[in-house]
Amino acid sequence: MAARWRFWCVSVTMVVALLIVCDVPSASAQRKKEMVLSEKVSQLMEWTNKRPVIRMNGDKFRRLVKAPPRNYSVIVMFTALQLHRQCVVCKQADEEFQILANSWRYSSAFTNRIFFAMVDFDEGSDVFQMLNMNSAPTFINFPAKGKPKRGDTYELQVRGFSAEQIARWIADRTDVNIRVIRPPNYAGPLMLGLLLAVIGGLVYLRRSNMEFLFNKTGWAFAALCFVLAMTSGQMWNHIRGPPYAHKNPHTGHVNYIHGSSQAQFVAETHIVLLFNGGVTLGMVLLCEAATSDMDIGKRKIMCVAGIGLVVLFFSWMLSIFRSKYHGYPYSFLMS
């Protein structure tokens, strides 16, 4: 009985000793992991305090964004800002990204849960190759746990690159809400003040004769300008903040018309406005040719010019519509 008791005591002692020996490396590894994580967070916080958007090369990206351990998310903008790249959209997107990062850095809700970083192609081309990335700018959220999923890549062509739109996307992916605070822009109030001053000056100069306020042609022209601006998608641009155009970084080809029906470029708005204006001018000429008291020769010229404008610009408008709504069966002169 005593021998059996000694056997059990020795067995229990050996098991406990074995567990302690095995736990020592595990605890040591855990402490080392926590130290590495603490160093990474401290480094990121130090850089963020100096500059809200951290510039990264390949080494920094692999060490601080890709390599574990990590308990923070990193929003990375992949871009090409060097002048010889001639990426106008990259500069515009960078300005919005800086506004967003500054809004987060100087907000009362600022924590180390999320950081903003930037990788320029000329400083980290190996990162672009590692991620098989062939366009810029691109925004990707690298979450605290796991690899980026499909939704962690920002849909720039659909949402645009305004700071407010990127902030909504970040809130969806990280549950971190950022209130965008833009620096004051005095251009709008100045233009409004100038417009009011001009109108006030005209009213003052013509105070003895106010018939110009009831001029049908003036009001019709103002209404037409407003309609052309609204039907061309100007309000959509104001809300979404899309890029002016898109330049392929590899071929250098510039696209002014977006290939999807869910988005558009600012240049596309100007083109559509021009085409609508051309059709409108053609219709006005046709109406004048039919109702004017001018001689028959001038009326014929106006009629031919009006038909030409309507046919040409409507055909161009329809071709743009076909390029955006794939499968649309109808065309006119141009496919």
Curated annotation (Swiss-Prot):
Impact when changing V311G: Found in patients with X-linked intellectual disability; uncertain significance
Pfam family membership, one: OST3_OST6
Membrane topology: Multi-pass membrane protein
Location(s) in or outside the cell: Cell membrane; Endoplasmic reticulum; Endoplasmic reticulum membrane
Tissue occurrence: Ubiquitous. Expressed at very low levels in brain, lung and kidney.
Extracellular topological intervals: 30-184, 231-270, 322-335
Bridged cysteine pairs (disulfide): C87-C90
A GO MF term: magnesium ion transmembrane transporter activity
Family from the record: Belongs to the OST3/OST6 family.
Name this protein carries in UniProt: Dolichyl-diphosphooligosaccharide--protein glycosyltransferase subunit MAGT1
